[in-house]
């Protein structure tokens, strides 16, 4: 009974101690929470103390670049398609059986190269027949001329009448006309025989064959035997906004050929370089664009017919232009501006007038000068007159590349 009484007292004491500990814990937490607003209020009431606190904090890190003076090319860009300078469907001009093909698919051929042969048997027979008829009529003409000569001698002594002489003269003339017709028939038969050998009409690359050896073909077949595309040179047709026409015309009047570059679909690799050939003679009223044609030598076969490319045409070069990274140019309510760093790394906002720009750099025509440092990263943390810390951009080079660079630097120092 006595042990049970002691146990209850022990439990009561433990509970009391726990309650006291909990009370002190919550009391301390409330005191700390009430102290924070007071500190904030004190800071707000003491501007000088706030500025001292800011100075004690870390400076905003930014990245910067120096405005440089350089020549900047001006490009006009558009989307275009590569087209063959000439595309020819090779068809047979005579009817007959296809006996042979003398090309490999994809082969480069020259004008006049033999491509295919049609069975020439019927054309040889027709030629021989025409030649035989010509020979026969020539013999007839020779005999008629001899008779005419005799008639002319006899007419002098009145042994033949004038009517007989005229009739013989007409026979000679008629036979001469027949000879001309025979000669035309021989030429036609010879031409048919020549056409049985089908040759390339232009230089270019042959495509896939459209018919196999042994088939009967005719001059009316629309598919033809093969298609030749001329790829040396090759053309690029692209479009420009109508607002660019005056710029192109003015550049053409300068007398120098305008350089056109062909870039791949992703605009990351230059495929080839050519020159402007011509502008179309009218604007597309639906799209407000004009077609432009450029020509490329394409000796390396980098361009292929119907290939989609991005076109860039150089129309002008701006000399002594002030250039900064595009990332430094900002837009606000007052217009375009940049943050400029002074010698103490304090920033100030400068309104600028931008010019030519791309994804990497922009020309500044007014507002800053070459040599000025502009902020390119960390701009969202800036205020007028704030002092910042200029840090270098994080390098993506590997340790091995860095070691190689250091080794080259050492070699350069030794040399």
From Swiss-Prot:
Cystine pairings recorded for this chain: none
What is known about what this protein does? The MdtABC tripartite complex confers resistance against novobiocin and deoxycholate.
In this chain, composition skew of type Polar residues spans 31-46
| Assembly notes | Part of a tripartite efflux system composed of MdtA, MdtB and MdtC.
Extract one GO molecular function annotation from the record. Answer: efflux transmembrane transporter activity
**Signal peptide extent:** 1-21
Could you tell me what this protein is called?
Multidrug resistance protein MdtA
* Compartmental location: Cell inner membrane
- Keyword terms of this UniProt record: Cell inner membrane, Cell membrane, Membrane, Signal, Transport
Q: Which gene encodes it?
A: mdtA
Which ranges are annotated Basic and acidic residues under compositional bias? 399-415
Q: Does the UniProt entry include the keyword Nuclease?
A: no
Q: Name one GO cellular component term.
A: plasma membrane
Tell me which family the UniProt entry assigns to this protein. Answer: Belongs to the membrane fusion protein (MFP) (TC 8.A.1) family.
